[in-house]
A protein has these predicted regions:
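Membrane-interface alpha helices of multi-pass inner-membrane proteins
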Residues: 105-106, 110, 155-173, 214-217, ...
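Membrane-proximal stem/loop segments at transmembrane-domain junctions that anchor or position
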Residues: 227, 231-303
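Membrane-interface anchor segments at the N-terminal boundary of transmembrane helices
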Residues: 72-73, 286-349
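Multi-pass, polyprenyl lipid-linked donor-dependent membrane glycosyltransferases
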Residues: 27-28, 51, 55, 59-60, ...
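Extracytoplasmic catalytic/substrate-binding loops of multi-pass membrane glycan-assembly enzymes
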Residues: 21-36, 45-63, 69-72, 229-234, ...
Length: 577
């Protein structure tokens, strides 16, 4: 108990302090969650009848309202429920796989950075993770066979608690909404083929999901009666719209230096308004119909890899980064699935993990969604994997093989991060619209043995620059990209710096080019380098950092927009507007 739970809890709390001490408040909490929580405190009866209430799932708002809508109080509550989630995960692992699994779960929860960040950040992740941990713990209690006079009462209580926890988790983040009926039906179907304690456990797990499905369904019916739409909250339209955008590989736009372009569809209504959400959903459905199946599947495979192992778009370059921890958790989870295959909870946790992967692939990629959805589940499964290794007769040999296997996985993940295809916007599926095209006389290339705009040229040193200085300032927008066409490329580049200068003011951003391939253009948003409008002078520079001798040939430079909303809007909305 001391080394398996108490010490990990102390370590976890100590690691949370730095994040809890940050004075900044995330955008969504500052402008959505906290204001709604204050409205809830002012007038509870009217809050859920106002249009603002459908913009987010109610769980996070109620949680922050219970803390007085005070950021310090919410962070304090985050610390408390995060430690409780760790303890619940510890005991759930013990009930499934014994003491070794419990100790492993405690350390696997506390050591990686992901759940520390999710638990401490002032957002909806912390209550969601806690409620998922509570649901899994109560379900593990309900799945256990009990004897004695109070057995029926205890099992009934844990079934009800698990159902309520799963309901609250779904109303905090609605990702489990489709899981509820699916799991209930599967458990009922399996129960018809089972006998004895296994059948009873399957029926109790089915009852948990029936309770949650009924309560969440009642809330959805209430939303339909109040606002005319069956939903937990809006936001699914934007999530699918950005997640299907082939220009950005389904990633959130800031990963490419862009702002969100939902206004091209919502016309200022807001992506969380009923009409804005409907429009974005229609455009997303049109994209799914129009995009080639091969391109869509290729994007989904890449996103599945990002959901499981994170993306190079936000990973640091250390070998033991978040991807390394995910590799460890996923590989150990595979062993854990095998080790817990005869326990009902092994199927519940494994099924939930597979489901969460599936529902997060089509929607907008952001690592915090993956962390809150998967990490508790993976910790539980990975703990079972360690317990399974420990139970082998030749445990030391099994452990050595496992360590070697994990090391190889980490090395492969690190290699992929450094050498996979560079993450740049792609104009192949959606034609880009030119905002301004650079004239030849306004372009100046330096650092190559000849002009790369005329013919293929090699870099003479490890840096080279392309400067664009138009005669007049050019129009800019937060969804505009700098485009540098590249028809030839051979060699290796580390990064390119995008810099904008205007009358003495300068802003720049670094773009990773590791893994740049022949056929890729340099496309990057100017949102992070925008300067105030006005003035006469305007200058854009791309400064490459590549190996000497790298061969490049360019084909024009300019400002372009490749908005999926503008391109698909007419097909999706014209008959309905």
């Amino acid at each position: 108990m001391l080394w398996g739970l108490v010490v990990p809890m102390i370590l976890y709390a100590a690691r949370m302090v730095e994040i809890l001490a940050r004075p900044d408040i995330p955008f969504d909490s500052l402008y959505t969650y906290l204001p709604l929580a204050r409205q809830l405190l002012e007038d509870f009866s009217k809050m859920f009848s106002q249009p603002e209430s459908y913009k987010v799932a109610p769980g996070a708002v109620i949680y922050m309202a219970l803390a007085g809508a005070d950021p310090v109080a919410v962070k304090t509550a985050n610390l408390a429920i995060s430690l409780a989630a760790l303890a619940l995960t510890f005991d759930t692992a013990r009930r499934i796989g014994g003491r070794v699994a419990a100790v492993a779960a405690g350390w696997l929860y506390a050591l990686p950075h992901m759940l520390v960040e999710a638990g401490a950040t002032l957002m909806g992740e912390s209550p969601f993770v806690f409620l998922v941990a509570l649901w899994l713990w109560a379900t593990s209690c309900a799945a256990q066979a009990r004897t004695g006079r109070r057995a029926a009462a205890v099992q009934t209580a844990t079934v009800v608690l698990a159902g309520l926890a799963l309901t609250c988790a779904t109303l905090t983040r609605a990702t489990y909404m489709y899981w509820l009926p699916f799991a209930a039906i599967v458990c009922l179907a399996l129960a018809t083929r089972m006998q004895g304690p296994a059948r009873s456990a399957a029926l109790r797990i089915a009852a948990i999901h029936v309770i949650a499905a009924a309560l969440v369904g009642a809330y959805i019916v209430r939303q339909n009666e109040t606002f005319g739409r069956p939903m937990v909250a809006t936001g699914s339209g934007a999530a699918l719209y950005f997640g299907t955008n082939p220009v950005l590989s389904g990633y959130e736009p800031p990963f490419f230096g862009l702002a969100h372009d939902e206004s091209t569809v919502s016309d200022g209504l807001g992506h969380l308004s009923l009409e804005g959400d409907r429009r974005l959903m229609e455009v997303a459905k049109t994209m799914l119909r129009e995009l080639p199946a091969k391109a869509l599947m290729k994007m989904y495979v890449r996103k599945l890899g990002a959901v499981l192992f994170f993306s190079r778009a936000h990973l640091d370059r250390h070998v033991l980064n978040d991807r390394a921890w995910r590799v460890v958790l996923v590989l150990l989870s595979i062993l854990g699935l095998w080790g817990a295959r005869r326990h009902a909870m092994g199927w519940v946790v494994g099924g939930a993990a597979a489901y969460q992967c599936a529902v997060h692939v089509p929607v907008m990629y952001n690592p915090r969604y993956s962390i809150s959805a998967l990490d508790v589940l993976l910790v539980l499964l990975a703990a079972q994997g360690i317990a399974w290794i420990w139970s082998r007769q030749r445990r030391h040999a099994a452990a050595a093989c496992c360590v070697a296997f994990l090391g190889a996985g980490i090395a492969l993940g690190s290699y992929h991060q450094r050498h996979s295809r560079a993450l740049l916007a792609d104009f192949h599926q959606i034609p880009a619209v030119a905002i301004a095209v650079a004239a030849d006389k306004d372009l100046h290339a330096q650092g190559w043995d000849s002009n790369p705009f005329d013919a293929a040229a090699r870099m003479t040193t490890n840096t080279a620059t392309v400067d664009w200085t138009p005669e007049q300032p050019l129009p800019q927008d937060m969804i505009t990209m700098v485009h540098l066409g590249m028809t030839r490329f051979e060699g290796q580049c580390r990064r390119v710096w995008l810099t904008q200068r205007k009358e003495g003011a300068t802003r720049s951003t670094s773009i990773s080019l590791e893994g740049l391939r022949q056929g890729q253009d340099i496309n990057w948003g100017i949102h992070h380098v925008q300067l105030p409008e006005g003035g006469k002078s305007w200058h854009v520079q791309l400064r490459f950092e590549c190996s000497p001798g790298t061969l490049m040939q360019f084909e024009g430079m300019g400002l372009y927009q490749a908005s999926a909303g503008r391109y698909f809007r007419q097909k999706a909305l014209a008959p309905k507007e």
